[in-house]
Regions:
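Positively charged n-region of N-terminal signal peptides that target proteins for export
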Residues: 1-5
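Short amphipathic, basic-aromatic surface patches that mediate peripheral association
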Residues: 26-35
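Exposed aromatic-hydrophobic patches
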Residues: 87-96
Length: 148
């Protein structure tokens, strides 16, 4: 009986002590990035692991793409640049929720007119539980958006 009671109290502490891994999933839908000849080409996505999002929000797309270290400074923990093919769904990065409070994504399109190119999310707002937590984003012809 004592073992059951102690297990009942210790199990939640164990789960709270374990840090959660958040997967950043990005889905690139068909015809999201048409070039001048109307070919569906891959997009380039840069996923930033951030301590704070203020500098990320204020920065221009060109500054982020060309001089991210100078623009983001110590707020940037890490970044990864990847190309995502049309109709592809990838896990761009897995981050520790306690170490990485924010994730920012910059998408570079062949034609940028009137598209949402930047987005960010708190890792604590990820869906799921434990090791199955995720932040899901979708790239379409309108730009990038978060899917809840």
């Amino acid at each position: 009986m004592f073992c059951k009671k102690s297990l009942f109290f210790l199990l939640p502490l164990f789960f709270c002590a374990c840090s959660s891994v958040v997967s950043v999933k990005i889905n690139n839908v068909e015809n999201s990035n048409l070039n001048n000849r109307h070919d569906d080409v891959p997009v380039t996505a840069i996923v930033y692991q951030l301590k704070d999002i203020k500098k990320f929000e204020e920065a221009s797309d060109i500054d982020l793409a060309t001089r991210e270290e100078g623009v983001l400074g110590k707020d940037k923990l890490d970044s990864i640049k990847t190309q995502i093919a049309p109709k592809d769904n990838i896990i761009a990065v897995k981050v520790d929720e306690e170490e990485v409070p924010y994730v920012g994504i910059l998408v570079l399109f062949a034609n940028n007119t009137r598209k949402t190119t930047k987005i960010w999310a708190k890792t604590e707002d990820a869906n799921g539980f434990g090791k199955n937590k995720y932040l899901k984003f979708e790239i379409s012809k309108e730009g990038i958006k978060r899917i809840k």
